[in-house]
Amino acid sequence: MSDQATTLKIKPLGDRILVKREEEASTARGGIILPDTAKKKQDRAEVLALGTGKKDDKGQQLPFEVQVGDIVLIDKYSGQELTVEGEEYVIVQMSEVIAVLQ
């Protein structure tokens, strides 16, 4: 678990993953400062913590396809959003992760 997730004491369960979306630039290319309402949700996020994992039909633990620290691509509207101490996080299922960016 990352230091940030440990400090917050957030532990996803099952095949869920705690991520933090990357921040949208607050200034447009022309130098115009964008209000929060004009910013779009980012679909890139950093993996902060992994749940306990999922088991197959035989009870074998299935490995996660991501690791803490990976930058992943998720759907803009997926997961459960939560705000802790003014910071926004999202808990998504492994199946909602579209790709790992390298």
Swiss-Prot record:
Q: Does the keyword Cytoplasm apply?
A: yes
Q: Which SMART domains match?
A: Cpn10 (SM00883)
Per the record, the GO terms for biological process are:
chaperone cofactor-dependent protein refolding
An example of a Pfam family matching this protein is: Cpn10
Query: What GO MF annotations does this protein's record show?
Result: ATP binding; metal ion binding; protein folding chaperone; protein-folding chaperone binding; unfolded protein binding
Q: Which key words are in the record?
A: Chaperone, Cytoplasm, Stress response
Under HAMAP family, the record lists:
CH10
Quaternary structure annotation from Swiss-Prot or TrEMBL: Heptamer of 7 subunits arranged in a ring. Interacts with the chaperonin GroEL.
Query: What this chain does, per the record?
Result: Together with the chaperonin GroEL, plays an essential role in assisting protein folding. The GroEL-GroES system forms a nano-cage that allows encapsulation of the non-native substrate proteins and provides a physical environment optimized to promote and accelerate protein folding. GroES binds to the apical surface of the GroEL ring, thereby capping the opening of the GroEL channel.
- What name has this protein been given in UniProt? Co-chaperonin GroES
Q: Which organism is it from?
A: Chlamydia muridarum (strain MoPn / Nigg)
